[in-house]
């Protein structure tokens, strides 16, 4: 059949475009079936819509400095700083125009982030210039916040605190510090609380890595990460137990991926299959809270097969004979499997990979520390590294991923209720 369009009473077509298409179709295909008719009709309608929209399209004009409210003569500076989110410490170049932080770039020559940014770091500027940023003192009056001056705020707060101390004593006030404070701020806060006459102060480390500080310090004298993020590229094997670095410390995993390119083996031990586990060579699922049985199960196989570093232990470690005695007597493979649900073959595999690929490192975060047995879990991890002779060597050690950007420094000198700055007392 032919595709034609009915004319109006004057004989003229109501659409020149459709008439042109109809004549073309009739010349090219004198007859067509129903399917071809529907297909070609759709093409014609689409072409008509496209042509009708041409007059609505307009080239955008370039925004001039005057139109944008700028003169183009602003002073631009680049300030080198450090990301304030997690403990990785990625370097950031902040671009500042007329004193305002306008944009940022990751630092490519930084040995830590190597020009990389995670989603948290990319949003760092919003901490200073976000719409919800508090820029001045506010006071709640009749259910609404009103702006007040700094002098008024300091005077009212000071008066109220002195009244509280007079009525109820200095311990009536509890001061919460911060792991976001720099060392100087944390130190001054601790001193201020002491001058106030109280010891009621603390910060995020209490529910973060305070168990790490105590556990590591009680094992070899100081409670801190022994190596560094970029040193992990020298590791031959890495055991992640209690850490989901891919999400909590994304840039840190960059160094492990570089290490894997060089042949490093990666083991992830976790109750959940995480994004970190997705990058591992081996994933071992254990029962939540059973880290100690698993680690001691690894020690059992290390001692049984003679994989321990005997010279290192004799030269540098005290009391390992008692640890070995307890492990061999109490943490046999059947007891370990009963406690943590991991078959003997999987525990053996993890122990063998760590022992035969040295230097090997162990990584943990709050998957270990946020337990009532956090100190003991941390000590078990440290003992494993001492047995293998991995402490004090490049590519080994305990890589403890802290939660906040200065939680280590704030813990060292800041508002801990159980010690003075520098862990005195």
Q: What are these regions, as identified by a protein language model?
A:
Residues 168-172, 308-313, 361, 392-399:
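Flexible, glycine/charged-enriched surface loops at secondary-structure junctions
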Residues 52, 162-167, 349-368:
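Short amphipathic alpha-helical segments at helix boundaries and their inter-helical linkers
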Residues 190, 334, 352, 382-385:
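Active-site phosphate/pyrophosphate- and oxyanion-stabilizing loops and adjacent acidic/basic residues
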Residues 2-305, 316, 323, 343:
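N-terminal export/assembly segments and adjacent metallocofactor-ligating motifs
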Residues 354-425:
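A glycine-rich, hydrophobic/aromatic-adjacent loop/helix-cap motif
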Residues 174-181, 338-342, 365-372, 404:
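Conserved short loop/turn motifs at secondary-structure junctions
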């Amino acid at each position: 059949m032919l595709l034609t369009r009915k004319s109006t009473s004057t004989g003229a077509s109501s659409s020149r475009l459709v008439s042109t298409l109809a004549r073309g179709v009739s010349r090219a295909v004198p007859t067509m079936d129903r399917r071809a008719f529907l297909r070609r009709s759709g093409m014609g309608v689409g072409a008509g819509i496209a042509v009708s929209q041409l007059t609505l399209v307009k080239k955008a004009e370039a925004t001039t400095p005057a139109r944008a409210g700028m003169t183009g003569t602003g002073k631009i500076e680049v300030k080198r700083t450090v990301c304030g989110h997690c403990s990785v410490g990625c370097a950031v170049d902040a671009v500042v125009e007329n004193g305002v932080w306008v944009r940022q770039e990751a630092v490519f020559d930084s040995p830590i982030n190597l020009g990389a940014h995670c989603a948290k770091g990319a949003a760092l500027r919003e901490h200073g210039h976000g719409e919800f940023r508090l820029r001045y003192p506010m006071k709640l009056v009749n259910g609404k916040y009103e702006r007040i001056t700094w002098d008024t705020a300091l005077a009212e707060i000071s008066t109220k605190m002195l009244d509280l101390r007079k009525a109820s004593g200095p311990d009536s006030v509890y001061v919460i510090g911060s792991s976001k404070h720099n060392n100087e701020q944390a130190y001054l806060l601790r001193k201020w609380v002491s001058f106030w006459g109280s010891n009621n102060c603390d910060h995020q480390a209490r529910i973060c890595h305070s168990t790490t500080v105590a556990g590591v310090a009680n094992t070899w004298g100081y409670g801190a990460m022994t190596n560094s993020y970029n040193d992990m590229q020298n590791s031959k094997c890495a055991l992640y137990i209690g850490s989901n670095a891919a999400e909590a410390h994304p840039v840190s995993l960059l160094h492990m991926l570089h290490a894997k390119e060089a042949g490093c083996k990666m083991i992830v031990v976790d109750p959940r299959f995480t994004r970190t586990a997705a990058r591992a060579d081996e994933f071992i699922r254990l029962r939540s809270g059973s880290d100690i049985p698993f680690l001691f199960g690894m020690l059992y196989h290390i001692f049984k097969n003679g994989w321990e570093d005997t010279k290192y232990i004799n030269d540098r470690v005290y009391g390992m004979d008692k640890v070995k005695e307890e492990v061999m007597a109490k943490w046999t493979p059947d007891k370990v499997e009963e406690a943590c649900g991991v078959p003997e073959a999987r525990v053996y595999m993890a122990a063998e990979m760590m022992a035969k690929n040295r230097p090997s490192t162990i990584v943990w975060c709050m998957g270990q520390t946020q337990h009532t047995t956090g100190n003991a879990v941390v000590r078990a991890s440290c003992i494993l590294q001492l047995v293998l002779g991995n402490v004090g060597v490049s590519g080994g050690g305990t890589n403890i991923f802290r939660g906040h950007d200065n939680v280590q420094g704030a813990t060292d000198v800041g508002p801990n209720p159980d010690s003075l700055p520098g862990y005195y007392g």
